[in-house]
Regions:
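Non-catalytic accessory segments flanking enzymatic or RNA/DNA-binding domains
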Residues: 1-114
Length: 114
């Protein structure tokens, strides 16, 4: 399976260049018509990343933040995207990561981390 989104070496380079703390995150997103989960990795603060309506056009809540090495958070993202490929969801309103990182359900392993 090909994992779309941030390429491993690109993310590792970005983490070194920005000097930020790599984080694997899971958020719940919703509005009056939709509810879904979005996972991802970042070296920025999640509140900064999704702090505007343009960046995140849905109501949202952080369910999980796991800071670790760039390699570890990248590998977590790939693992959970693979586990949850059958639950993939494309939200009606587009935002960064909405096409590849949203899901209707969570894997058991991810639920246990929350």
């Amino acid at each position: 399976m090909k994992i779309k989104g941030c390429k491993r070496q690109s993310f590792l380079d970005q983490a070194v260049q920005n000097g930020g703390q790599p984080i694997f995150y899971l958020i719940k997103c919703w509005d009056k018509e939709e509810s879904f989960f979005k996972l991802g990795i970042t070296v920025n603060n999640i509140l900064t990343r999704y702090g505007t309506v343009k960046a995140m056009p849905y109501e949202w809540q952080i369910l999980l933040e796991l800071p670790d090495t760039a390699e570890a958070v990248y590998d977590l993202e790939v693992k959970f995207k693979t586990e949850m490929q059958d639950y993939h969801y494309k939200p009606k309103i587009s935002f960064n990561g909405s096409g590849t990182e949203c899901y209707t359900q969570l894997s058991e392993a991810l639920q246990q981390l929350i």
